[in-house]
Amino acid sequence: MLRLSLPTFESRPANPPETRPPKVKAWIDELLRQPSAVEAARVIGDALAATNRVSMSNSRRLELAEIYWHAAYTLWPLLEQHFARVSHPLAGVALDAAKAAVTLATEMSLAYKHLLVREADRRLVLSGPRLLLALVHRCMQCTTRILVNSYLSYAPVPPRTWLDAHAIYAFARERGLHLNTVNADTSDMTPERAYLHTLLLALANPYGFLPGQLAIVARYLLTHCTAAKLTDVPPVHRMAKAVAIVPVGHDFPPFSANKGGSVEGSKIYLLTFDLAFKLQEELRALDAGGPVPPDIGSDANARAQYVTLLRRLLRQWAIPPARQFNRLPSRARVVICAGLPGVWQYSRGEHESVHKSSSGLPAMSACQVVNHTPAGYALRQTEGQPGALRIGDIIALRVEGRTGLQVAMIRWFRNTFKGAGLEFGCELLSDAPEAAAAVAENAPSGTLAPVIILPEDRAPHATDHAPPQIIVPAGAFQVEQAVSLRRGGHSGFAVLTKLVEHGPGFELYEFVPVA
C-alpha cells in the first residue's frame, strides 16, 4: 500500500471552495489576466489548498488538478523573475513571490498525491496502468518544482517532500512502472529519469549555485541524467567514490557514500561513474579549446564560469569533499562588510574591534556565529535591517574574541521566509589580508586598482604552503599578465599565474612575485 503525507479532509469547512471545474477555470483565467502574478499565485494557491482538504470524486479532483496545473505552469516563470536573481535576504515582493511559488508547488503536489493514493488502492483497473503512470509522472514533476523553487530562493525544502518522493519512486519500481514512458509526446521521459533528475540536482549542492546556474544544471541533466544508475545492490565498498545513498523511508535527500554515516531501513544506491566520465570528457574538450553550448555565451567570462561549474559538478557527483573538521557550536558576535571596495578599506587595518565602528569606512552589519571549523563559518544575520548579500560575495569579518581581520567568500545561503536575516556559510580565505594597489606593467600609474593580497601562509588549516593570491577588480587583469604592486611604501612586480575564483565584482588569482 502506498502511504503518502496528506492532509485530512474537513467535513464542514468554514469557507467551502468552489469545485465546479467550469467555474474554477473561468475564475482562474480572470486571475491570470491581472497585472500582479504574485497576487494571482497567492490567491490560486490558497484556493487549491482549500480544495485539497475537502472530499470529492476522483474524476472531479483530476479535472480540477489539471486546471490548477496549467495555471501554475504559467505562473512559476513569472514568479521566478521576482526572486531568482536578487540579493538576500529576500524582502518585499521578492519574498512574497518566493513564498507563493513554493506554496503553489506544494499544493499541486498534494492534489496529485491524493489522486495517486486513491488510484494505487484500486484492486481492479480496467484501463491498465496508463492513469497510474501519468499520476506518478505528475507527482514527480511537482516534486521537481518544489525543489527548484526552494533552491532558487535558498529556502529549506518543505517537510516530507523527500519522504514522499522516495516512496513514489519505490512504488513505481515495485509496480514495474519506473521505466515506462509517460506518453508519446515525452517518449524519453520515465519515472526513473525524473527521479534521477531530482537526486542529481540535490547532490550538486544547489544552495551554493550562483544566480542562473541552477537552470544550466537542470538543462544538463535533461540530456545526461540517464548516465547515472539506480540499483538495490550495495557497492563493494560502502565508502566508494561516485556512489550516493538514497534513504528510502527518510525525509532527506541522497548523500554521498564517501561521507560515511548510516541510515536504517531500505536504501537505493545511485551510481554516477558513467556520468563522471562524461563530465571528464567534456572538460577535456573544453580545455582543448572546444566550444561551449550555445546557451552559455561566447565571451571568455561565460566560458570560464561554465568550466568552473562543470568542475564543481564533477567534484559533487564523483568525488565530493568529505568534511575534515567537526563543526563547533558558537554564539560569538561577528561584524561583516561585503564587496571588494569595503573589504579593501578594512584590510588597511583601520578597524579596531567588533564593538567599535570606524568613522569614514563602509558600515558593517552584525551577525552571530552558528558553528565554525578552521576552514570557515556558518553565520546568522541578527540586525533588524540586515545587509544585502549574494552567493560568491567576498566579505571582511571580525569575530569577537579574535584579533585581526579575516577575509572569506560566501558559499551558501539558507533563507527563513520570515523576512529576517538569513543564515549563510563562508569559506575562510585569509587571516592576514593586506590592502595594496596594482597596475598593469607599462600602464600609467594613475590607473592603480585597489587589490587585496592574501599571503602565502594564508589559512590555518592548510597542510602545505599554497601560492600567494591576490583579489582584484573583475576584468582588470588576466592570466600571465605582469603587474606592478604598491604595498605600503614598497613597490614590486608580480605575474598572475592562475585564475582561482571569480565572484560579484572581483577575481582571485594566484601570483608569483618577480624580483
Model-derived regions: residue spans:
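Intrinsically disordered, low-complexity regions
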Residues: 6, 25-29, 41, 236, ...
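Sequence-level detector for tyrosine residue identity
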Residues: 68, 73, 112, 151-154, ...
